[in-house]
UniProtKB/Swiss-Prot annotation:
Family under the similarity heading: Belongs to the bacterial ribosomal protein bL12 family.
InterPro entries per UniProt: Ribosomal_bL12, Ribosomal_bL12_C, Ribosomal_bL12_C/ClpS-like, Ribosomal_bL12_oligo, Ribosomal_bL12_oligo_N_sf
Subunit architecture: Homodimer. Part of the ribosomal stalk of the 50S ribosomal subunit. Forms a multimeric L10(L12)X complex, where L10 forms an elongated spine to which 2 to 4 L12 dimers bind in a sequential fashion. Binds GTP-bound translation factors.
Keyword set, alphabetical order: Ribonucleoprotein, Ribosomal protein
Gene field: rplL
GO cellular component: cytosolic large ribosomal subunit
GO BP annotations, alphabetical order: translation
Signal peptide: none
Function: Forms part of the ribosomal stalk which helps the ribosome interact with GTP-bound translation factors. Is thus essential for accurate translation.
Superkingdom, taxonomy of origin: Bacteria
Protein name: Large ribosomal subunit protein bL12
Lineage of the organism: Bacteria, Pseudomonadati, Pseudomonadota, Gammaproteobacteria, Alteromonadales
One Gene Ontology molecular-function label: structural constituent of ribosome
The species this protein was found in: Shewanella halifaxensis (strain HAW-EB4)
């Protein structure tokens, strides 16, 4: 003889809250599942698929040719000699922030050609 859904519902209605909790725990254990509601995150995939449009160029090291890197920094940023020297010696430091991908790639190439170690974030 099989039990119908209605009979199960009637049996549940007759149980106390503690008995229902114990039943749920037993069902979780027997079937290897959780009664916790599944969390649905909306928009997470859309945000991940969205391409980054602003980049920061970070000088991680001035390398062996500090003078050439200082000259490249002065040309790229318009800083004075003292400010560019301080920037080169303060690595890691952001050279430019929130710039386009093309501008970031060009700046990175210029600084690397001068001997600096650069990363784009």
């Amino acid at each position: 003889m099989s039990i119908t859904k209605d009979q199960i519902l009637e049996a549940l209605a007759a149980m106390s809250v503690m008995e229902v909790v114990e039943l749920i725990e037993a069902m979780e254990e027997k079937f290897g599942v959780s009664a916790a509601a599944a969390v649905v995150s909306g928009g997470g995939e859309a945000a991940a698929a969205e391409e980054k449009t602003e980049f920061d160029v970070i000088l991680t090291s001035h390398g062996a040719n500090k003078v050439a890197v200082i000259k490249a920094l002065r040309g790229a940023t318009g800083l004075g000699l003292k400010e560019a020297k301080t920037m080169a010696e303060s690595s890691p430091i952001a050279v430019k922030e929130a710039i386009s991908k093309e501008e970031a790639d060009a700046l990175k190439a210029d600084l690397e050609a001068a001997g600096a170690e650069v990363e784009i974030k």
